[in-house]
Regions:
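N-terminal glycine-rich FAD/FM-binding segment characteristic of electron-transfer flavoproteins
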Residues: 1-228
Length: 228
């Protein structure tokens, strides 16, 4: 089992397409900011692509303290091989406690592959996230028919509580990952509220360009064209 004391921070994989950030990025960074404030840690965006440093600071306006920019022509278009390698290498190097990924077509491909390589769990298509157990209990009061008076809750629990619909939406399941790190979830687009953009925070956002290893030999697929 990993030493949990080594894992700090809430990370968001920030998806870009043709050099433009996705609205899901801003939703997830905004939600990550809330979680990080409860954990007392930083929010870090992880941005992969080719010549994408110029769009990174916008993520700071929604709550990112820093953005790790991995720039390479080999990352211009999404390929599972390249992106999974770089994301996992960054996670193994910097050890975030939480990693959020948008449940887009790309995120649904990338998330499970990274979780398998990192030997951790993944909650798919989450629609609600909590750290604070008291807030989670309030969420249950508002959204479920459970008799909470008969339930026992550990109010000292600081695991990420990831809630997602199951059985066609007839059941809401809350999942935790208490034994492995990072705690990973893909998050359904459009369900998290985007914070108002703050230009001062965007200006203050730190841009980091970490060293990483990626060669053409790491990539088994070739992108012939991208159709919109």
């Amino acid at each position: 089992m990993a030493d949990f004391n080594e894992y700090k921070g809430v990370w968001v994989f920030c998806e870009q397409r043709q050099g433009a950030l996705m609205s899901t990025d801003f939703e997830l960074v905004s939600e990550a900011r809330k979680l990080a404030d409860e954990l007392g840690c930083e929010v870090t965006g992880l941005l992969l692509g080719d010549n994408v440093e110029g769009i990174a600071k916008e993520l700071g306006g929604y709550g990112a303290d820093k953005v790790m920019v991995c720039d390479s022509p080999l990352l211009k278009d999404y390929t599972t091989d390249a992106y999974a390698k770089v994301v996992c290498d960054m996670v193994n190097e910097y050890k975030p406690e939480v990693l959020l990924i948008g449940a887009t077509n790309i995120g649904r491909d990338l998330g499970p592959r990274c979780a398998a390589r990192l030997h951790t769990g993944l909650t798919a298509d989450a629609t609600h996230l909590d750290i604070d157990t008291a807030k989670y209990v309030e969420f249950l009061k508002e959204s479920s028919t459970i008799d909470l008076s008969k339930q026992k809750f550990d109010y000292e629990d600081r695991n990420l509580k990831m809630t997602r619909p199951a059985f066609g939406g007839h059941l809401m399941a809350t999942i935790i990952c208490p034994r492995f790190r990072p705690q990973m979830s893909t998050v359904r687009p459009g369900v998290m509220k985007k914070a108002p953009f703050d230009q001062a925070k965007a200006d203050a956002c730190q841009i980091v360009k970490p060293a990483f290893s990626l060669t053409a030999d790491d990539i088994k697929t070739e992108v012939l064209s991208v159709e919109k």
